Amino acid sequence: MTPAAERRPLLPFGYARAHSVMLLSSGESCEVFCLAVTAPQALLEARRVAAMPFRLERLEEEAFEKLLVLSYQRDSAEARRMMADIGNELDLYTLAEELPDTDDLLDSEDDAPIIRLINAMLTEAIKEKASDIHIETYERHLQIRFRVDGVLREILRPQRRLAALLISRIKVMASLDIAEKRIPQDGRMALRIGGRAVDVRVSTLPSSYGERVVLRLLDKNSVNLDLLTLGMTPALLRQVDGLIARPHGIVLVTGPTGSGKSTTLYAALSRLDARERNIMTIEDPIEYELEGIGQTQVNAKVDMTFARGLRAILRQDPDVVLVGEIRDGETAQIAVQASLTGHLVLSTLHTNSALGAISRLQDMGVEPFLLSTSLLAVMSQRLVRRLCPHCRQQEPANADTAHQMEIAPGTALWQPRGCAECGFTGYRGRTGIHELLLVDDRVRMAIHRGENEVTLIQQLGTDYMTLRRAGREKALAGITSWQEVLRVTEQPIAEAC
């Protein structure tokens, strides 16, 4: 028998899976694999496509599934070529309306309709500047949603029976196991959409009515690594420049997933002169490639963890080290030791506030006296939607809003309205709001004494720029709305007590 690696499937994946029949060609000969329940009509179709004598073999269901996975994952090159450079001429909504019934798709001679639908979906997502595509399977419908400017909105509801075929094709493209539906899977693919280089991270998750898929889009052409245009004020930028010029210590950026932490760190690195410093990173994954910087990716399959990668980097004579995320006590301990031995360490933490990073590191086992010595600053950030400049309108602040913002009632505030330019959302694009905790002598002594967040923020006083106060400044400037600031920030601890 010819090895599976040398055989090419001749039937479209959808047909092979639906009818439990595979036709594999090695060039000079063909083999047909089926199940005991395979219909005679499917075998006749295989014979028609083969157009030559072939060997027929019936397999058990488990063996058939394994061969199906192996054969069509190796054949994904053709689909990759079809998606290698997606043009701009595809219209998602027209394609969805013109898509034939699912049964016709399964019986079609190629998988082009499904691939075209996926192409159109990706093209539309890039056009809308979406960060994520959600493909969600429910009992009676299939739903596709885009996350645009941090908010999900429904885009399309294709036929419910299309779910399995659509998700299976995405799995093939991401080199995932198409037969495995019981466990989550993660993969990625690199595409060109309208001439733009786009990395797509794929995550699947079993649910009660079928699999859910989330595609995270990383559009390398749209990356802005300018801290000013990312929303920093000139005064804050001067403080950040001073921090990254320090020879050693730890600088942390905190916030939830999708708040722009990695982009901020990349932008900070881009302000350093890589010709005079050895700058190295350990990331999961490498999101953007920076010239002159040594970037290493975490690989759990070979036990290449953040901690292990960081240890190796420290033997490479680095000046500046970026650790994608401090996830555990081991990584935290190594980062602290690195900062105490002459290295500048930049990293991220998942905490809700800058002050929360201190207690999080202590919970990970970092001793207060080491933390107070090594930590230079913590910056917490959020992304807020920008008001659409074409339709925003001014309204006087009511009493509740004025009280929350500590302004006079009736003060004019800009509000979202909605127009064709912003998709009738009232917002277009996003900007950052930032809270920077500089570890000065006062904060250093408080950390050393083990004081909690409430005590710390009370000591910092009203001059301390919390996230909500930073958002207030942007709302007063008409950059965003106060409702948007409330959506992404929490009430400062001192005010909540």
UniProtKB/Swiss-Prot annotation:
GO terms for biological process: protein secretion by the type II secretion system. The keyword Translocase applies. Zn(2+) binds at C388, C391, C419, C422. Its main location: membrane. It is found in: Cell inner membrane. It is an enzyme of class 7 (translocase). InterPro entries: AAA+_ATPase, GSPE_N1E, P-loop_NTPase, T2SS/T4SS_dom, T2SS_E_N_sf, T2SS_GspE. Its cofactor is Zn(2+). GO terms for cellular component: plasma membrane; type II protein secretion system complex. Keywords: ATP-binding, Cell inner membrane, Cell membrane, Membrane, Metal-binding, Nucleotide-binding, Protein transport, Translocase, Transport, Zinc. Pfam families: GSPE_N1E, T2SSE. It catalyses: ATP + H2O + cellular proteinSide 1 = ADP + phosphate + cellular proteinSide 2. Its EC number is 7.4.2.8. SMART domains: AAA. ATP binds at G255, P256, T257, G258, S259, G260, K261, S262. One of its GO terms (molecular function) is ATP hydrolysis activity. The keyword Membrane applies. Belongs to the GSP E family. Forms homooligomers; most probably hexamers. Interacts with PulL/GspL. This is Type II secretion system protein E. It comes from Klebsiella pneumoniae. The gene is pulE.
